[in-house]
């Protein structure tokens, strides 16, 4: 029997609708993939071969030229075509500098030192931050001579984000480079001024690769010594990949419209386009097309589940819903409140479809791990709902244990592994045990989200926010609590950076890149003290337009 409540009092009776910004814009997209293929495919392939020749034929003694080329390819967003060649080059170059004990760097300028440091660490090579010692004076301060080196300081600024827990010099370097760049930015000439201003707004290492590529193509076009062939290749490739993304977004948008869940659940956020943007942030390459579709559908459905627990369901209704999710059986639908029956049915249907899809390649076992994570998520959502309803303020540790689960990072990262064929059953087992890098992604998601949503949650009357729990337990101000949350995020990023240098490892490089990209999505979506997912107008809308609406002019 369905739950009957004579006089229902909703948690937020004055909830406001959360309509989509996009309407049917992407449903009505007419694919231009075939047209682009006919006109540009041959040229793209030809340019790709030219770039490959450039990459493989760089002289042995010109390390700086090789590293600059690799960095340019990565920042233009085309390096995915040359992963094998780039890794071979990076491995060879790192072995050279290690054998030479970094002596080759003694004559390098700051820009080159910092670029090499960043590139090697990005690729998992443990280059020492000691290469920056030569830029310090006898008092342990950075030399005055580099304070006017804008290009070098920008390179140092970006390199600092790859620091680990032992890199105290880079903690100081980040403060120094940030202050120096801020003081000189307005007086720089473009395109360097634009690059500095963008970097101060969004760190490269914490940015979304596809978004950063779109920005860099614009910057590179203004460079005096640009390579015209590389620029055209990047533009053509961006437009071709954009066409594929539009096709996927059209397919997903049609699926979402056919479900018609939002009309029945007006309290829920209609964010399927933003969910797809998130999936592209995790992996944008053509080979992950199916993975993006799987992840997008799950993110959009998870937002509805979150809103049901957070903004609409009563404790009695949520108790029934939690038990139904725990039992994971369509028969449970009969006991659910009427408004949520359709949603519950579609969740089970989605998982059945995912299982059938994965069964084709003998990987249906993956669904078990996602279902278990979904059950854990529902239980933790229920705990938060009880805290709010009863006005209970938990201790910070109690809050954090539960809220790391409700960050959804663990659950959604499991889903993100579905479409990656290299991920094995052993990888799912490893991840389910909450290894260090998994916890780091959860911490980043939790604390950055908590900072961004604090004021909105307080307006709703929410007392058990992470900030409030920390303030009460430690007797500090809101500002001090937020500062501590930023420190937790910084330390979690250092954990991720350290895990990226631990090769060979118990998990694959593909998994590492996905987890790092997931954390980057958090920084972009919530890192400017705004909830970009719930209120996408300011943060996500312009990025979505840049990636999925506007082509690059050739």
Swiss-Prot record:
Source superkingdom: Eukaryota
Record: residues binding Mg(2+) 1: 306, 310
Alphabetical keyword list: Cytoplasm, Lyase, Magnesium, Metal-binding
Signal peptide: none
Motif (DDXXD motif): 306-310
Annotated residues for binding of Mg(2+) 3: 453, 457
Cysteine pairs bridged by disulfides in the record: none
Cofactor(s) the protein requires to work: Mg(2+)
GO cellular component assignments: cytosol
Subcellular location: Cytoplasm, Cytosol
Metabolic or biological pathway: Secondary metabolite biosynthesis; terpenoid biosynthesis
Residues reported in the UniProt entry to bind Mg(2+) 2: 306, 310
Catalytic reaction(s) noted: (2E,6E)-farnesyl diphosphate = (+)-(R)-germacrene A + diphosphate
UniProt xrefs under Pfam families: Terpene_synth (PF01397), Terpene_synth_C (PF03936)
CDD domains according to UniProt: Terpene_cyclase_plant_C1
Gene Ontology molecular-function annotations: germacrene-A synthase activity; magnesium ion binding; sesquiterpene synthase activity
Biological process (GO), any one: sesquiterpene biosynthetic process
Role summary: Sesquiterpene synthase involved in germacrene A biosynthesis. Also produces additional sesquiterpene products, including 4,5-di-epi-aristolochene, eremophilene, alpha-selinene.
Similarity field: Belongs to the terpene synthase family.
Domain characteristics, as noted in the entry: The Asp-Asp-Xaa-Xaa-Asp/Glu (DDXXD/E) motif is important for the catalytic activity, presumably through binding to Mg(2+).
Protein name stated in the entry: Germacrene A synthase
Source organism of this protein record: Pogostemon cablin (Patchouli)
